[in-house]
């Protein structure tokens, strides 16, 4: 995956690529454009391409981009969320995709409004050192969450073979169903078609749209 910013984004090309993805997903999933590597001055190209939903990984970048382009998009927070950043992130976003710690729950209790909705990040793969709630602990974590839990999110182990992600996506869908949750944020540039097949309702795309 690249670690350089995307410049000279062609709105027409991006619009065409978005249509390809939307058609392939049969309209079942929202396409969230991850803008971590989209500089502030290129956000207008996303708007011109018809992008409606964007996701940011860092609170500082979210604040800067939202200040200039706040009315152009719906905004989600998709990065690792530090508890001390919750207060700043909440007013700017529709959803937080990465709630996974009790320290974040404590900040949500202090600062969230009545319409706040979050997704719980689940460590479906059981990887050590990886963020996310363990599946066995999920019901209790949902019970402790002081705001509305709309669904779940996961990041499977990285693989060049999209099929390697399938069992993790299928497991997340099972967990969502058993906990009566509607939203499934899963699938990124390397494995989104598999995620769509397994029931994703939000697909997070960056690199696949811009190169």
Q: Where are the regions a protein language model picked out?
A:
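Conserved alpha/beta-domain cores
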Residues: 1-190, 196-198, 210
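Divalent-metal-activated hydrolytic enzyme cores
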Residues: 201-202
